[in-house]
């Protein structure tokens, strides 16, 4: 059968019309060298700093170094899956993580992927991990309290919503315990319906043992605190790149609450290991080392993270993000590089001492050098009324105590002051995982400052406090309710409290 030229032309036209001309243009480079979680890539001329690249195996990388003829990227995963000569393609995206309430109650990795075996997270919103901190006009001053439930902190070193308060101390001095107690203490607020009272919590584990993280998750589940808590975990066995980005990812998750008129608390545990992970990455990328071999921008590493914690203005929804960074010192040396950096960035520090810890003063807070620069504005009036003189009295007690070691003959007035100081120290002690509601803290500190404990033997102070609070909860609930609702001690309430305490002390000392 002979085809006419016109028919041939028609067939060709139909075939040409069916051809899909859409071709995808991809920028592809090649891995020159790989090792220690770092890949040097050749051929990605237009790649940006902070961009995500994808290796042949599907593992992602983050570009940090832009050099003349190659780029340096950190591998966010197992570097054994990346081989020399592998193709690498640009994604033209920066790192994003899922955010929102769907993450609450879950344990996720640094990239926001669930690692608790409870299935996928149905999150509709994603945010970049690196966000610009709010400007001065967008912020307002700190004015609402974050109740930690710890007497020594809420009375002497109060923390406000939007504040950055550093928890610093040697290993095994109870830094994480303070953070976990603060999370557990938010349970009371979450039982209320008012959204403005609630604080959502984010705990970031950086470079910790998996067993430690599992222990914290178990403790929070037992206390019923996981319902409003999210845990971001980048453990010691994970790539340094993941330990480096974990705090930024978690901060973006916290900013979702801050920017939607809610309140969030984020705990970075700990930023010492974060700085070590960044140092490792920087040295492997052959960046010039500075003091203690940290790179020159290690201050900016933490300042750009902690500046994202803020109390937003009314025009921006009045939300807040409070940060509690943790730093581990070596033999109490707070003048090392990273501790001094973070002290200068934050709005105060809670200093924990191993010496106090071993003496049985727990939480082992050194009240003398701990400070809260903005939190006192957020402290409720009732706490100011009772705790105003405690810091001074404790400072005088420490001074007298050190003098009394040299001589045995003390005049009666000094002896009375030392005995009073010892009882104040005793009343500020507290068991782990037992945060107190603020109204009960106020009653306990009132008892200490008004010298009701002078007749109580020192070793019975704890027993006295437990029995007194049990009695007041059962029979004098109106006193606690009045302090809670009025947020100050009215004359009427004080009279009731005095009458109750005078009777109780008589009964107890009998």
Curated annotation (Swiss-Prot):
Its main location: membrane. It is found in: Cell inner membrane. The record marks 370 as: Required for activity. Keywords: ATP synthesis, ATP-binding, Cell inner membrane, Cell membrane, CF(1), Hydrogen ion transport, Ion transport, Membrane, Nucleotide-binding, Translocase, Transport. It is an enzyme of class 7 (translocase). Transmembrane segments: none annotated. ATP binds at residues 169-176. Disulfide bonds: none annotated. It is a peripheral membrane protein. GO terms for molecular function: ADP binding; ATP binding; proton-transporting ATP synthase activity, rotational mechanism. It catalyses: ATP + H2O + 4 H(+)(in) = ADP + phosphate + 5 H(+)(out). GO terms for cellular component: plasma membrane; proton-transporting ATP synthase complex. Its EC number is 7.1.2.2. SUPFAM superfamilies: C-terminal domain of alpha and beta subunits of F1 ATP synthase, N-terminal domain of alpha and beta subunits of F1 ATP synthase, P-loop containing nucleoside triphosphate hydrolases. InterPro entries: ATP_synth_asu-like_sf, ATP_synth_asu_C, ATP_synth_asu_C_sf, ATP_synth_F1_a_nt-bd_dom, ATP_synth_F1_asu, ATPase_a/bsu_AS, ATPase_F1/V1/A1_a/bsu_N, ATPase_F1/V1/A1_a/bsu_N_sf. Belongs to the ATPase alpha/beta chains family. Produces ATP from ADP in the presence of a proton gradient across the membrane. The alpha chain is a regulatory subunit. F-type ATPases have 2 components, CF(1) - the catalytic core - and CF(0) - the membrane proton channel. CF(1) has five subunits: alpha(3), beta(3), gamma(1), delta(1), epsilon(1). CF(0) has three main subunits: a(1), b(2) and c(9-12). The alpha and beta chains form an alternating ring which encloses part of the gamma chain. CF(1) is attached to CF(0) by a central stalk formed by the gamma and epsilon chains, while a peripheral stalk is formed by the delta and b chains. This is ATP synthase subunit alpha. The gene is atpA.
């Amino acid at each position: 059968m002979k085809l006419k030229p016109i028919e041939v032309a028609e067939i060709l036209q139909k075939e040409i019309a069916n051809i899909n001309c859409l071709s995808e243009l991809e920028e592809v480079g090649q891995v020159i060298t790989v090792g220690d979680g770092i890949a040097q890539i050749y051929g990605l001329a237009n790649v940006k700093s902070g961009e995500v690249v994808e290796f042949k195996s599907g593992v992602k990388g983050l570009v940090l170094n832009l050099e003349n003829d190659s780029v340096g990227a950190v591998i966010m995963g197992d570097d054994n899956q990346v081989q020399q000569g592998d193709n690498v393609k640009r994604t033209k995206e920066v790192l994003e993580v899922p955010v929102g309430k769907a993450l609450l109650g879950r344990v996720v990795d640094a990239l926001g992927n669930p690692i608790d075996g409870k299935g996928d997270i149905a999150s509709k919103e994603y945010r970049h991990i690196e966000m610009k901190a709010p400007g001065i006009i967008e912020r307002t001053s700190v004015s609402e309290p974050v109740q930690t439930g710890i007497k020594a902190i809420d009375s002497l070193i109060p923390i406000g919503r939007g504040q950055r308060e550093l928890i610093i101390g040697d290993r095994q001095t109870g830094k994480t315990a303070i953070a976990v107690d603060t999370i557990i203490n938010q349970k009371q607020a979450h039982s209320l319906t008012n959204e403005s009272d609630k604080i959502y919590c984010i705990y970031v584990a950086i470079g910790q043992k998996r067993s430690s993280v599992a222990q914290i998750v178990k403790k929070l589940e037992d206390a019923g605190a996981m319902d409003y808590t999210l845990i971001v975990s980048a453990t010691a066995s994970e790539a340094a790149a993941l330990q480096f980005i974990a705090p930024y990812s978690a901060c973006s998750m916290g900013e979702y609450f801050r920017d939607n008129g809610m309140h969030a608390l984020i705990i970075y545990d700990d930023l010492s290991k974060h700085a070590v992970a960044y140092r490792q990455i920087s040295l492997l990328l052959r960046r010039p080392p500075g003091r203690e071999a940290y790179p020159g921008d290690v201050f900016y590493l933490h300042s750009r993270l902690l500046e994202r914690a803020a109390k937003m203005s009314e025009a921006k929804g009045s939300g807040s993000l409070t940060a509690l960074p943790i730093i581990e010192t070596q033999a109490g040396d707070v003048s090392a590089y990273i501790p001094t950096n973070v002290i200068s960035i934050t709005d105060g520090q809670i200093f924990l001492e191993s010496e106090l810890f071993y003496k049985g003063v727990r939480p082992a807070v050194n009240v003398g050098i701990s400070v809260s620069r903005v939190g006192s504005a957020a402290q409720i009036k009732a706490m100011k009324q009772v705790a105003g003189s405690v810091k001074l009295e404790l400072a005088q007690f420490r001074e007298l105590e050190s003098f009394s070691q040299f001589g045995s003959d003390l005049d009666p007035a000094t002896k009375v002051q030392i005995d009073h100081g010892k009882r104040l120290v005793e009343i500020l002690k507290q068991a782990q995982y037992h945060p107190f509601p603020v109204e009960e803290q106020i009653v306990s500190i009132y008892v200490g400052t008004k010298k009701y404990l002078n007749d109580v033997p020192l070793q019975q102070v704890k027993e006295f406090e437990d029995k007194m609070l049990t009695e007041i909860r059962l029979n004098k609930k109106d006193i606690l309710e009045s302090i809670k609702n009025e947020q100050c001690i009215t004359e009427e309430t004080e009279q009731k409290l005095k009458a109750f305490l005078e009777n109780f002390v008589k009964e107890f000392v009998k």
